[in-house]
Every structure is written in C-alpha cells, then in structure tokens.
Amino acid sequence: MSEARLLFLRHGEVASHRGDVPVTDAGLVHAERTGKAIGASVGGPVSVLYGGTRRTRETAEAIVRGIDASEAVIGPVDAFALRNPDMYLAGSRVNMVSAPEFLAEQVPCMTTQQVEANEWWAGFTSAPDRIGWWLAQEDPPGESSRDVARRLERFARSFADPGPHSGRLVVCVTHSPLLRSMLRATTDEDPGEPGYVTGALVRVGPAGQLHIEPHDPLDP
C-alpha cells in the first residue's frame, strides 16, 4: 500500500437546500478561485470527484476550470461514496432536505402530513441545525454519522491502491453531513457547518493510517 492525499470539500454556495439545487453565480466564482489555488499549490496532477448532486458537480466543474491544466486533471468524475447519507422514509431512499414537503416529493404518493406525523423526520425538519441533530442520533432511519465516517475512511484508504489516481491529489466535492461526520469521528466533537468549498485534508499513510485535519484551500 502506498500513500495518498485527498481534499474533501463542501460544494459551493446554494440559495437553499430544497432539492437538487444549482450553485449560485457567487458560488461558482468561489469554486473557480479555489481550483486556481489548488492548482498553484499542488504543482502536479489532480483528480476531481463529486458526490452525485447538481451542486457538487457544478462545484467540481468550476474547480477544474480554475486548475486550468486539463492535461493534468482527471475528472470531474461522479463518485458514489461521496453521496449524501443513505436515509429512508416509507420504503424510499431520501435526501435530507429542509422541509416536510420536500421529503414528501421524494416518496411516491406520500403527503406532507404523513411526513409531519413521522416522529424522527418531524424532529429533523424542525431542528435549527438539522445536520447537527442527525449527528447526535444513534439509530436514525438510515446511516448514522459513524456509518458515514466509516464509509469515507474506507473510501480514502482505497486510493492507496495502485490505480489511475496514484500520485495525484484527489479533490472530493461532497456535502456537509459527510464532512462533519469525518471530522467528528476524528475529534469527538461536531465542528459545526463547514464553509462553502472548505473541508478536510486527508493523508493516507503506508500502513493505511489516516491523518485528517480541517482545510481551506484559500487560507491554507
């Protein structure tokens, strides 16, 4: 097993979390500036991955534009491990959106009133910090914070295997629940909501050990 470096970043600014929303114009500018900073600091090949949603894809595309060295970049590539937590409601996988009506939209034939009658999801949607509320739940209807942290740890270690990303900085554009889960597993404390296009730098050692620390490419 060799060593690997991964930079996990939250997606760019969005106007809301009401479904699969786009990144704002300001968010795209921020992401492109971040890509430029990454390209200047790395001075070598980069891979850019994203977590399935429109906002992570648009952020990843802007980062690639900022790096401005297409011959040295793999991506953007959709990476399944970077998806939001797998959560379930009435037999359907749902994303953790901001209101009962947006949950109901994800489940065939479900009503907003039925979501509101679900004790767990009613607690989630009414919490001032929804992701913080989920982090504290030991047995949610889906992946827990620890489950997500383990997923990311295994994903990160896999980049030490010989393959197309060997010797590259791997930029992983994802979502705040994943970043907060990873950092919480490292420090035993919830770091709070990360800023847009900030996150964590992960180094994988030759024996598979992980070193994880908060990181902002524009303020390293």
Task: Say what each PLM segment does.
Residues 1-86, 138-146, 192-215:
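Active-site-proximal alpha-helix that buttresses catalytic centers in soluble enzyme cores
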Residues 1-3, 69, 82-104, 158-169, ...:
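Acidic, low-complexity terminal tails and accessory targeting/binding regions
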Residues 8, 171-172:
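Structural beta-sheet core signal
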Residues 12, 175-176:
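Active-site metal-binding loops of divalent metal-dependent hydrolases
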Residues 32, 54-58, 150-153, 176-180:
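A structural signal for well-ordered alpha-helical segments within the folded catalytic domains
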Residues 32-39, 153-161:
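Generic structural signal for well-ordered alpha-helical scaffold segments
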Residues 61-64, 156, 183:
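Non-transmembrane alpha-helical segments in soluble domains
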Residues 67-151:
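Phosphate-handling substructures
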